Every structure is written in structure tokens, then in C-alpha cells.
Amino acid sequence: MPPLEVSVLRDDGSLAQKSSAELRELGRLPHPMLRRHGEAGFSQISWDDALELATAKIAASSPERLGFYLTSRGMPNEGYYGAQKAVRALGSANIDNAARVCHTPSTVVLKSTIGVAASTCSYSDWIASDVIVFIGSNVANNQPVATQYLHHSIQRGAKVVSVNTYIEPGMERYWIPSIPESAVFGTRLTDRFYQINTGGDAAFLSGVLKHILHNGLEDSAFIAAHTSGLEELRASLEATTWETLEAQSGSTQLEMQNLGQLLGEAKSAVLVWSMGVTQHATGEDNVRAIVNIASARGFVGREGCGLMSIRGHSGVQGGAEMGADSSALPSGKAVNEQNAALLEAQYGFPIPSSAD
């Protein structure tokens, strides 16, 4: 994108008439711009002046009145880490980033179930997997680099399943530029689509797990060694009728049983989800249903297996791990007096021990 001609900002009244597309076409800001009280528009200032102005405003504000927000696209880990350290040095805990809005349900559920708020596998595990299930996720559009791994997994014979409210065209067939054969003829990415209601994820996945448990397809050894609460979950699923699950999911008993049988017979599987799962009032329930299936089948901690909360931007996971979050310190540690004291010993200045 070319640099913006700063003269167009001297009177910003004309900008109000432009569409968002027209505003983007103006280009990127090449210099700091300032609009002073009473002026019709913005004028260019130096970087030194911009930094001095921002510094003075921050210094004049009390810590509880400060707030810092970091976006994720293009932000490296070092930027996240340095920002959270600077904000906490100011005595504030008011730092946030775009990743929290996207995957908070994943963070909460993964931390409370498996102990780590991150994916348990990598793209290379797709290649070694028998089944790859995408739930509310469209990698062809949102993570196109990942499709080359998907292509190789398909070549090995993996079954690819999509659970979504919409049959995404890119998930039907995609042309992968880095693979000559695919670039010419395209690659069929998905073997089977399961369409569900908006908000029907948890019900559909509960039906899948209901079939697995009812037919004895669970991994009993893994469950005994690594999980708890199976019998309570089994009783809850048995008490839920197929009619209820059909009404809530928008799918059919046969389709839920079909996917349950596929996963029940698979030796390995990766469950992948994205915004289509988390951006709901029931986001945590949706993610928990995914974790329950993986736990019941032992699809965690082995090659070709895993839970993958796939991210949309290059720097998103860094925001979660580097502590650019009012409720988490670096490495994802909770904000409390004990963890704050450990960080204080390293940094040499007081760390706010509350996220409020």
C-alpha cells in the first residue's frame, strides 16, 4: 500500500464523505499527524515531537486511567513482551490484545482441562493423521499456507471433515500455489461436510461423543490415566435424547453417528477449530465439547493427534504467551500476588497483582 498524501488530512471534512474502501485507497500514514484544538484537520509533526507528546500525556495520567491495546497482525513476540513490561512498570495492568477477543473461550477451556492454553500439535501432525476435523474453521481462506500440509495429508489417505453452518467453497476445492499439481488442477480438501445450525456446535459434538461412548469406542486406557469425570459426562449424554440434539444442532442422528463412528475407528485424529466455534455466547461449551471428544478417544499427546485452536494472524499466540493481557503474566501465568512477586524479583519494580 503506498504512503498517503498527507495534504488530504489538512481538512478532514471531506473524508467523512468517503467509503471505507476509498479511505483505504488513500494509503498508509507515512508520518505522525496531529490535530490541535480548533484546527480543521491534521498537520505533520516529527517522531520526536510525537513521542514527547505521548510521553507527557502518559506521565500526567494515573495508572488506573491508562489503557493499552495491541493488535496481532505483524506484532512480534518481542513487541508484546516489551509492551507488557513497560505498562506494568507504569503501575498499570490495563493492557489487552486482539487475540483475547478471538480465542478467550479456547484459553479458558484448554487451561482448565489440559492445563495449557495452546494447541497440542502442529501442522506436521496433519500429515500423519487418519482424520482431520475442521469445526467452524476455513483454512483455505484464513490460513492458506496450511493447505499445503492438508494436501500432503490427503495424499497419504487422511479423511478430512468440515463441521460448519456453511459449505465454504474454498474448503471444497482449493488451488495451492506451492504445489504444481494443485496449482493447475486444484485439490479437493474436504471429504464430508456436516452442516449445522448457528450455535449448534456443542449439541452436534455431544451427539458425536454420545455415539462413541454408547458403542464402546472410547480409549479406556487413556481415560483412566489422564482424565476425570467420564461417568458424569456419560450420564449427561445418555439423559439427552437424540431428538433434543437434532433440534439444537440442526443435524440428524445419522450424521452425528456417522462422524462418531469415523472418529471411533480412527487410530489418530486432529480436531481444528477457529472463530466459528468461539464467537458465541456458548463458546466455552463448544470448545469443551471438542476437548471431550479428543480426551475420550485419546487424541492428545501422540503423533498425528491433537487439539488445534487455529489462529488467524501471525502474532496472535505471542499475545497470549508474552503477557500482553490484563489477566495473564508472561508464559500465561495468572495475575496474583505470588506470580507478581516472582516477576518483581526479575524486573526490579512492583508488578500489579490484580487484573482489576
Map each language-model feature to its residues.
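Long, contiguous juxta-domain segments that are non-catalytic but functionally important
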Residues: M1-S19
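Cofactor-pocket helix-loop regions in the catalytic cores of large enzyme subunits
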Residues: G27-V316, E321-M322, L329, A334, ...
